[in-house]
A protein has these predicted regions:
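Alpha-helix capping and helix-loop boundary segments enriched in small/acidic/polar residues
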Residues: 30-41, 67-82, 101-105, 109
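An active-site-proximal "capping" alpha-helix that borders the catalytic cofactor pocket
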Residues: 77-94
């Protein structure tokens, strides 16, 4: 049993050039726009897909066998998309710190993620990816990892971002493991 994912790099490159970069020019200060990279964008997409497999699918709640999907009901897809995003960032940070991947990605992945968050949320919060990214953006703003600048652009505080992705990953993984709908 397993899964197979097909990623079309040329399609993602077109999304990056035609959608993400124009969004970054509006949403980020000029200096931060230099920290938006295709490698960080594409690598995070790959990690996002891998992270869908992270965590339990079958759990035990109150002595009964069930699934995370059954327990989380209509919130499951939103929480799953948020988990894949934030745990993907967490995993990339771990791999970069251990030099399993080029550590240079650490300089661009958070700012690229911020720009990409605006790309994802434009689909609205009536869709799982949009709701998931809205949760993450609000969490990052609350933790000071994302900040709104006086010119109404957005920036990343890398140090706070590292702590925020770790804590949000932990919260989501715990929520799923416990099947905590409330």
């Amino acid at each position: 049993k397993g899964s197979k994912r097909v990623m079309l790099k040329n399609v993602q490159d077109a999304k990056f050039r035609m959608v993400l970069q124009p969004i970054a020019r509006v949403a980020l200060p000029a200096a931060d726009q230099k920290r938006v990279s295709f490698d960080a964008f594409f690598t995070h997409i790959l990690m996002h897909e891998l992270m869908h497999g992270l965590g339990p699918h079958n759990i035990n709640v109150g002595g009964s066998a069930t699934t995370v999907r059954q327990q989380l009901k209509e919130t499951y897809s939103t929480i799953e998309e948020a988990k894949a995003d934030v745990s993907g960032l967490w995993a990339l940070a771990q791999l970069a710190n251990q030099k399993a991947i080029d550590p240079a990605i650490a300089r661009t992945m958070y700012t690229t993620f911020l720009a990409s968050a605006f790309r994802s949320i434009r689909f609205g919060i009536n869709e799982a990816h949009g709701r998931g990214i809205a949760i993450q953006m609000n969490y990052m703003l609350d933790k000071g990892a994302f900040r709104v600048n006086p010119d109404h652009t957005f920036s990343v505080d890398d140090a706070k971002m590292t702590d925020a992705i770790t804590s949000l990953t932990r919260e989501i993984m715990t929520l799923q493991a416990e099947g905590s709908y409330e």
